[in-house]
Amino acid sequence: MTNILRPTNFEDVIGQEDVVKRLKINSAGCKISGSVMPHVLIDGPPGLGKTTISSAIANELQVDMYTCNAANLRSVKSILPYLMGISPRAVLFIDEIHRLPKLVEEFLYPVMEDFKMSISSGEETEEMELPQFTLVGATTSGGSLSQPFYDRFTIKEHLNFYSTDELAKLARLNAKKMGLTVSDRDLIEIAKRSKGTPRILNARLKWYQNYILSVGNDGIDAIFNTQGIDCFGMDVYDRLYIEVLEKNVGNPLGIKSISSLTGIAVETIENSIEPYLVREGYAVRTQKGRALGKTRRK
């Protein structure tokens, strides 16, 4: 399903227009000149298309793409196979790049700048030249990268949440790919329940399809109420988070306290729950902690 719905080039990407425009200019210029595209850092909440855009970069450049997750690169040794096997002008995509250990970050400094790496074997150190390539890093926490590492990315882009109209347009396109007929009204309602995030939209579409096929069309509210999704797109964890803040009005809570009270992992709160709720005004982050925002559930 992911492969069916994921765009393969910039022309097929819906939303993030300014980001896509700049990356198209960069990739087209590099392709014409035959030069290597500068290293790229893409920041933003989960599910907004960082992997999709990285893949589009490689496809636009017509080069190979190598993919890895920083969570699996716990030592210099673990990244060597990617570097030693990389082809000229290729894209090396590292997801969750903020998870790289400092030692691996520092090892990549000369790799990114000069395309050289030093490998120690016993008492000897061998310097190897690498083909020039583009490192594309994706992160939900750009501020977690060390400054020297951050500065080595020439191109830095931030992805924003999608509007309801953009998501409805994407829903129409993806529903067609899925062979699913959806009314314009339902497309809008699915988009409203997707928290500004394409990945969530695709999950909502799949649930909608399965419900229609197995139960029937009982109406959009019944379809998503069964899944525990309200008209704002909030699930049980979002509501639990808000309920904790409602019970502590005037008493901002630290994230660890919220985690303890809700049973939700800190990382899940930071990456999956708070970005949307803060953006929509349901919650605010203050120096003293998290507090209830001005937006209220109806």
Where does each model-flagged region fall?
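AAA+/SF3 P-loop NTPase mechanochemical coupling elements
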Residues: 120-138, 153
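Conserved C-terminal helix/linker of AAA+ ATPases
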Residues: 187, 202-205, 209-231, 238, ...
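Terminal-proximal interaction/regulatory segments of ATP-powered molecular machines
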Residues: 246-298
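Walker A/P-loop
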Residues: 28-70, 81-88
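C-terminal helical "lid" of AAA+/P-loop NTPase domains
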Residues: 188-193, 199-214, 242, 257, ...
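Dynamic helix-loop-helix/coil hinge segments at AAA+ ATPase domain boundaries and subdomain interfaces
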Residues: 1-22, 230-232
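Conserved AAA+ ATPase core "coupling" helix
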Residues: 144-178, 184-192, 203-204
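Conserved AAA+/SF3 P-loop NTPase catalytic/coupling segment centered on the Walker-B
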Residues: 56-57, 76, 88-118, 142-152
